[in-house]
Structure formats: structure tokens, C-alpha cells
Amino acid sequence: MAPVRGDGMRGLAVFISDIRNCKSKEAEIKRINKELANIRSKFKGDKTLDGYQKKKYVCKLLFIFLLGHDIDFGHMEAVNLLSSNKYSEKQIGYLFISVLVNTNSDLIKLIIQSIKNDLQSRNPIHVNLALQCIANIGSQDMAEAFSNEIPKLLVSGDTMDVVKQSAALCLLRLFRTCPDIIPGGEWTSRIIHLLNDQHMGVVTAATSLIDALVKKNPEEYKGCVSLAVSRLSRIVTASYTDLQDYTYYFVPAPWLSVKLLRLLQNYNPPTEDPGVRGRLNECLETILNKAQEPPKSKKVQHSNAKNAVLFEAINLIIHNDSEPSLLVRACNQLGQFLSNRETNLRYLALESMCHLATSEFSHEAVKKHQEVVILSMKMEKDVSVRQQAVDLLYAMCDRSNAEEIVQEMLNYLETADYSIREEMVLKVAILAEKYATDYTWYVDVILNLIRIAGDYVSEEVWYRVIQIVINREEVQGYAAKTVFEALQAPACHENMVKVGGYILGEFGNLIAGDSRSAPMVQFKLLHSKYHLCSSMTRALLLSTYIKFINLFPEIRGTIQDVFRQHSNLRSADAELQQRASEYLQLSIVASTDVLATVLEEMPSFPERESSILAVLKKKKPGRVPENAEIRETKSPVPNSHNNAHSNAQTNHTSSANNANASSDLLGLSTPPASQSGTLIDVLGDIYSTANGNSNVVNNSKKFVFKNNGVLFENDLLQIGVKSEFRQNLGRLGLYYGNKTQTALQNFVPTLQWSAEDALKLNVQIKAVEPTLEAGAQIQQLLTAECIDHYLGAPSIVISFRVSGGAPQKITVNLPLTINKFFEPTEMNAESFFARWRNLGGEQQRAQRVFKAQQPLDLPGARNKLTGFGMQLLDSIDPNPDNMVCAGIIHTQAHKVGCLLRLEPNKQAQMFRLTIRSSLEAVTQEICDLLVDQF
């Protein structure tokens, strides 16, 4: 059968039909391979192929590529099609080049030459195909190769309009890739004057190009302002003298009008020329007037085009912010849209009014719509519109309406969508502080926030209320009374407990005179919440209790009993254990004067910009008004690590060292040892009061997932560790605590790590004093450098002698497993599974199926994997129960990429763990570290 000539390629149609009729993936691949073999034989055959046949086979290759198969031949045949004079053949050649050829191809020079030939052609269709190909590829090489030809085509008087339009868009694409492609000087004026072109396509494309050029070099292209205003005036004035043929549903050239209005927003003000400014204001007034006219058509296209121009004009009015009458008119027009039936229109009106509210000229006009905006916040069905209403209320708030707006936002917060609650909390907190004339009102607002939306109250918010109360003496008593009453609620949020604990610890004495809030009542109220709180809050409450001992000596015994409780002194949380032991010892050995000095009230905080405002700016950059700044105290945040460790105590207790654990570890400035008999004797006789036992606790295995805590403990010695890792470097602080009543002599910790292993993991250890006094604690510093991948971990052998006893030796594995040098790596599903497939070799993967050691705890497993050092990737695996992670192990020699997949089976109570990495030894080691941890 003779081949069909023309655009209808029968062979291509038959091939596509065959592919669609394939019943399986294997059948499809078989048919594709057969076709590839046929095409390859045709290209290599002795018979010369004509243009039609080349086009047909190149189309088939293109279709196969689009099915997801790699194509490694046919490129030369596609390049040959570029020299054809037939449009259909040249078009297919350019299509193949645009899709399959990359800039590193050996054929790129030949392709560039073919494109240059077409750019010089007198056939505008060929020129357009070449320009479209350049724009589609848009590479640096293309920009450099055609940096002279395309600008010439754009400004040449001989160039056809359709080619000029393509040249402008092509130049815009290349400018985004290579901003230096467009020459300056005389070219600037010639490009700007394209705004006067009579062809709609040319002037629209040129406006987009000029807008991009202005953003890079506004001064050089400032001449475009007068031309843009003039062109806009000719379009929107009543006579419609310009572009009459381009009216879209009774709106003249709406797309060009929008582009011109956006172009003018690059300058502020657009012009100093009073004539041009007057003409621009006339245009803007005309657009606002037309918005008031009855619609000329009921079709949605008319209203969409009309409103698009209107909103862009309003954006320009807001940007200029210099014409009060225009700003007020714009505000009134937007106010009409607030009750429009179109949801999108209401959203855009609220968004634009947010900007108008920040202008001194239109702020009062915006406030007139307050009731409608409040109604929108409460009644709108679309959450995004409600969000915009909240934003507008925040923007229009000032001293005159702050209390009303804050109260309305608090009322709405109880039923607000979860997605906007956190942001609303921040905004209410900022408004309450910024416009508070009475700080008792501010305290009430923040406590209400915590009561209504405690889960969404960030640390910055409750830190801030504490700082405000500390800095303002007149509100301290009220705050103590109010928070005491709030804590009496049956269901009390943990953030309320934090605020209450802190404020009562500082100012509880101000309300202690009332029998209803006597010292013991305050203490029992707080302690009733203790066991319901997290470790961080418990630590804060312990600090409050030691403050109570200073404020209310009469309840000292009750509080000391709490410190002595087994759950505190023997807490699994090292911070709670340390605080309980230190605070108990402090309350026992310190005199009243020393206690008062150590636990005196927190001083006032110096001021800085609000951290709450900074959080809000981070959440919605560009949406927080510039005049929203409030001043804030610059202070250590009152968190559980330092809130009650005030002044002298920060110098006199080792808990204060804990408050700056990172700086101590990095600065290597921790004192070598504490001296028995002083306030920093953190162990003292405490352990004699606890229930002694002879159990040995070795937590080395748990440190696969954590960096800080108690590493080892027996009746004689406690070893704690704090560590930090960055890429292939690590630093550890080991803390040795003597639990006995006598000194430990000949105390020598020795690193146990072979010379061969030291070539892969270099560990340096600093010596310590040979005597560890009774009840004392000393620190030893280690540094580690991962040079190459290694197995296992070094250990430390501690030898010592107890006075009058036999020599002792303790061996503990150090938390220096290979996973400590992980860097978490973010990636999307496509990247993850592509990498997963690439690491599918037998030597690159390890898989274990094992029984869970305890009932399946998926949140716990996720926490463990996060602590392991890899990045836990959400929404990657189709099964939501499965966990996938990615990370890079840093060594001096190389980086090792690792992927992990953990698949739980709830019915069988089993896990399947799969590890893939580029090194077999690392794969096996990671698998071995994890397999017995779940």
C-alpha cells in the first residue's frame, strides 16, 4: 500500500491504535520494541528516506518518549527535518528538538545553525517556529547564541507583527534565564516605544517584556511610564479611540489594560510630571466611574473582564497612596462588593481593603465597613473568605475599636476553623498588647485565649504575657488573682498551668492574705495539675515550688516531701531528677538570706520588637502592616530550663548550666568539678534519702535515638551525656556523678577503640582529675571526627577505687554509632522512589522481618526514627502506616545516601525493615542498629 501523503500519517495512527489495544504492560513493551527495531532499521538502511517518512518515524519516536521510554537515536533525522521547506516536517523537527534534545547534545551546534537559518528566512512561519523552539528550550546557550538576532527582529521595521509578538515573548523567556541578554543604550528607547504599536499582540507581549525589564533596571526604563499612561488613557477614555477591534464583552482590551496598570506599579510614584500624573488619575477615575455603571451584558465574561481592570486599578491607587479622594472612592467601591453574591469578588474585596486599611487616607473609610466584615468572619461558607475577613479586622484595628474587634475575634475563635486558629491567636495577642490602655484587660484577653484555644497558643504568646506582668507592677496582683481563679477550672489547659505556675511563683505572695488563696491552697492547686502535665511543665512547676519555699516558709516541709518523692528523684527524665535533687538540697542547706537572694523576683526585661509579631510575619510575609510594630522585652524566654533559676541561682546551681547546655558544651567552659559543701553540691546526701538499690542501669542501647540523658548508673556512679553532631563532627560531654559518701580515688576514664577503627572514627578525649569527691560531679569532653564509614562504636572504661574497697572497672559503650552523623534529607515522592529504584542492587539493600518487642506503637516508632537522625518523609508511601526516611551520612571521605522503609503489620505484631544505601557495609550496620529497637 502506498503511504498516505499529507499530515495524516496512517502508520503513526496504526501504531498508536496498537499501543492502546495492548492488554498488558508486557504486550505494550513488546510492541514498542518491535517498532523501535523497525525504525532503527529504516534509519540505518540503504534506502534514502523522504521527508514524509522521516517525519512519520520521528513522530513515532516522540510518542514512545511521551509514554515514558528512553530514546537514544533519531536525533539526526529530526535535525534534518529542520532544513525542510514543508511546514509540517519542520514543525515535527522543532517539536522533537524542543522535547528530547538537551543542551549538552553533540548536535547542539548544528541545531543552532539551523535555527539561525530560519530566523533569517523571509517566511514568517519559519521564523515563528524557530522563535518558539528557542523559547521552549530557553537555555543559557540559546540566550548567548541568539542575543543579537532576537532584539533585532523585535525592533526592526521590516518584521511582521506576528513575528514581533513571538520575538518579544521569546526575549522575555531568555531574559529570565540570562538577565544580561538585552543590550542597553539605544535599544532601551526602541523597546519602550513598542508600547505605541498598533498591533494588539505586539503591544501586549511587549508590555510583559518591559515589565520584567523594569523590575531589573527601573531607572533605565523609566521612560515607559508616560507611554504606558498615554496608551492606557487612549484605551479607557469614553471615545474608545484605540484598539476598537479588541473589545471583549464591551470591555476594551482588558488584558492589555491590566498589564499596563501592573507596569505602572513598578514605580512609586509613577511620575513626577504633573501632566502625566493628572492623566493617570483621570484614567483611574474613569475606571472607577465605569464600575458604577449598569452592566452592559449579563454574561459572566463581561463582569470578569470589567472587575479585572477595576481591581488592578485599585491596586495601583493603593500603591501610589497619594490621592485621598481616589483611595476613599476605591474603598467605597470595594465595600459594595462585600455583599456581592460572587464569593471570589468578596474575597478580592476583603484582600484589597486589607491594603487600604494601612493607608492614613483610607483607614477611617475602611472602618465604616466593620460590621459587615465581622459578619463575613462569622457567616461566610468559604474558609478562605473568613480568613480574609480576620486579616481585614486585624488591619483596620486601632485604639478606638480594639476592644470590640478583639472581643469579636475571641467569640469567633471558639468555633473557628482549625486551619486559622493559630494565626487568629497571634493576631488577638498582638492587638491586645498594642492597644491595651489597661493591662488588666490584656491579662484577661490572653488568659481567655489560652482557655478557648490553648492548643494553638504558641510559646511566644504565653512568654509575652509573663514578661508584661513582670514589667508592670500595677498588674501583678491582678494577674496572680486571675490566673489562680483560672486554674480552679476542672479542665485546665497545660499552657494555663505554665502561666499560672510562673506568675504564682513570682507573685503568689500578693494574694496569699486571702484565705481562699492561702499559700497551701495555691500549692495544692498547682500540684493537682502536676501529674497531668508534660515533663517540661513539671520542670517549671518544680521551679515554682522552690520559689514557694522562699515566699511561704510555712509550707517548706510539704514541698520538700514532693521533691523527695520517688517519681521525682528517680524520674526517667534527667531534667526533673536534677531539679528535684538540687532544689531539695538547696532548701535544706541554704540559709533564709541566701535562699532569698537566689530566688528573688525576676528583674524587668529590656525592650525589643515583639517576637509574636515576628512569628506572624513569618507565617504571612507581606501581610502584616508595617505600622504594627510593638516593643517587647529582650530577655531569656521563661521556659522550663530557666524560669525560676533567677539571678544568683544561675551562677550557683548546676541546673543553670543545664539552661545553657549547648553553650557549655560548645564553649568547653564548664567548671571541672563542683566542691562538696557548697550550694552547687548537687548530689550531697540526697541519695541516702532515696530508696537505695543495687540495680545497674545501662542505657547505651537507647542512645541510638537520643543525644542527652543518663548513660549509665549503679550504686556508686552515675554517668550522664550531652552531645551535639554537625555533619562529620561531634562533641560529647560526659558527666560523672559520685553517689557515695566517700571520694573515688584513681578515677581514670580510658577510651577503648582500636587503632584500625581510629582511622575511620577519630575520637579525642580530655583527661579529668583523678579524684572524684563525695557527692561531686565532673565533666569530661570528647570530640569525634568521622573520617570513613565504620562499624560498632567506641567504649569508655572507667577505673577507680572506693576508699577502703576493691578496685572498680566499668565499661560503657559511647553514643557514637554511625547514625549520629546523619543529615536529614527532604525529598518528594518522585525523587524518593527514583532513588529507591536506583539503590535496588543486591549489595545495596538489606531487609529484616522481625517480631515487635512490645505492642505496636506507631507514633512511638515515628519518634524513634526522627531521633535516629534521618528525615521522616510524610505522604510518600501509599500506606499511611508505613514510615519512610531519607538521610545522608557525612564522613570526611565521602557522603553516603540512605533510604529507609519501615512497614508495620498490626495483626501479626511484626515489622518489615528495608534499608538501601550506596555502601553495603553501611546498609547492614544501619539495619543492625534498628532491628532490635522496635
Swiss-Prot record:
UniProt keyword annotation of Protein transport present: yes
Low complexity biased stretches: 646-663
One Gene Ontology term of the molecular function aspect: clathrin adaptor activity
Entry's transmembrane regions: none
Compartment annotation: Cell membrane; Membrane, Coated pit
Any Pfam family hit: Alpha_adaptinC2
GO BP, sorted A to Z: clathrin-dependent endocytosis; intracellular protein transport; protein transport; synaptic vesicle endocytosis
Membrane topology: Peripheral membrane protein
Keywords in alphabetical order: Cell membrane, Coated pit, Endocytosis, Membrane, Protein transport, Transport
GO cellular component terms, semicolon-separated: AP-2 adaptor complex; clathrin-coated pit; plasma membrane; presynapse
Regions of compositional bias (Polar residues) in chain numbering: 636-645
Alphabetized InterPro entries for the sequence: Adaptor_Complx_Large_Subunit, AP2_complex_asu, ARM-like, ARM-type_fold, Clathrin/coatomer_adapt-like_N, Clathrin_a-adaptin_app_sub_C, Clathrin_a/b/g-adaptin_app_Ig, Clathrin_app_Ig-like_sf
Keyword Phosphoprotein in record: no
Segments for region (Disordered): 623-670
Family per similarity comment: Belongs to the adapter complexes large subunit family.
PANTHER family (alphabetical): ADAPTIN, ALPHA/GAMMA/EPSILON
Subunit structure, interactors included: Adaptor protein complex 2 (AP-2) is a heterotetramer composed of two large adaptins (alpha-type and beta-type subunits), a medium adaptin (mu-type subunit AP50) and a small adaptin (sigma-type subunit AP17).
Reported function: Adaptins are components of the adapter complexes which link clathrin to receptors in coated vesicles. Clathrin-associated protein complexes are believed to interact with the cytoplasmic tails of membrane proteins, leading to their selection and concentration. Alpha adaptin is a subunit of the plasma membrane adapter.
The name this protein goes by in its record: AP-2 complex subunit alpha
Organism: Anopheles gambiae (African malaria mosquito)
Gene it is expressed from: alpha-Adaptin
